[in-house]
Design a protein with these regions (language model features):
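Extracytoplasmic low-complexity segments
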Residues: 20, 24-93, 234, 278-285
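Short, aromatic/His-centered strand-loop micro-motif at the edge of beta-sheets
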Residues: 165-195
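Short surface loop/edge beta-strand patches of beta-sandwich-type extracellular domains
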Residues: 32-42, 91-111, 178-186
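Short tryptophan-centered beta-strand motifs in secreted/extracellular beta-sheet-rich domains
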Residues: 115, 191-200, 209
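Extracellular, beta-strand-rich glycan-interacting domains
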Residues: 48-55, 112-121, 253-283
Length: 285
């Protein structure tokens, strides 16, 4: 009798469990494979992405990086209508500061830095005379004379605008990738949104500059440098909208701020293809 009772009890338990599983499967919750996945997972090639789309009363939250939820340490800039959603407007002596560009420098051998910008006419230094402006820079303790390990200069007017990218590696060797002199670019500072992508290939040691999805024919190179090899440990700040130095009240060209608008700032640890860059432009990303 005891064996029969145990068998009945076991059978009842199995029946209840089976019914429970069946009822769970009929619920409206999606199966595991149906849950949406983040297209930009933290371990992917997109290492830093600030859309500047926040509309809260907290400016640090409005400038958050979407990859690692890396909030800005400081954001004194105004939110404006961007090329897609919201963007930011740079002002004299002000910029957005992050403690790090996440792990971008740790993993980048090749890289792509892409963003949208809007600037009307002649670039100015912080005292109002003609001079360079910086969409971004990495402040660094690497000992480089500039105080940084990477920065981008946009300088000139709508008729002739120079673009200059400086990179210093772990050994404090540096290189300038420039489009200046006879290779300046017209039409960049016309108070309209433009997309810029800077693509470094470790295979060629060259940087391809894309404007609105179109590659510039001038591809400056860094000899046979290969992997970019930036010292991640020495990066002390990622600055959006300023050079790497701190002499803000002077005409110091390394301390000048960006006085236009910016949106969709992205940093990849790979060299995007032309098709990838064109997709960013076409999608206003």
């Amino acid at each position: 009798m005891k064996k029969i009772a145990n068998l009945i009890k076991t059978g009842c338990c199995f029946l209840v469990l089976s019914l429970t599983i069946l009822s769970c499967q009929k619920m409206n919750n999606p199966a595991f494979g149906d849950f949406p996945r983040d297209a930009n997972v933290p371990g992917g090639p997109l290492k830093f992405y600030a859309a500047f789309d926040g509309t809260t009363t907290d400016p640090l939250m409005n400038a958050v990086d979407s990859i690692r939820a890396n909030f800005a340490a400081e954001n004194p800039l105004t939110t404006v209508d961007g090329v897609r959603g919201k963007g930011i407007r740079g002002v004299n002596k002000k910029f957005i500061r992050y403690t790090k560009p996440n792990d971008w420098a740790k993993f980048a051998e090749s890289f792509t830095i892409a963003f949208w910008f809007k600037r009307d006419g002649q670039t100015k230094n912080n005292t109002g005379t003609n001079g360079p402006e910086y969409p971004f820079s990495f402040k660094s303790s690497n000992g480089h004379w500039s105080g940084g390990s990477t920065f981008l200069i946009i300088e000139g007017n709508n008729a002739a605008c120079a673009v200059k990218l400086m990179i210093a590696d772990k050994n404090v060797n540096d290189n300038w990738f420039t489009w200046e002199g006879g290779n300046t670019i017209a039409g960049l500072l016309d108070n309209r949104w433009h997309q810029m992508s800077l693509v470094y290939s470790a295979a060629t040691s060259g940087v391809t500059l894309y404007i609105d999805g179109v590659a510039n024919s001038i591809v400056p190179k860094w000899g046979n440098h290969g992997k970019i090899n930036i010292d991640d440990a020495k990066i002390s700040e990622l600055r959006i909208g300023c050079g790497p130095q701190t002499n803000y009240d002077t005409d110091d060209w390394l301390s000048s701020s960006w006085k236009g608008e910016l949106d969709q700032f992205r940093m990849y640890s790979i060299a995007l293809t032309t098709a990838d860059v064109q997709a960013l432009f076409n999608g206003k990303q």
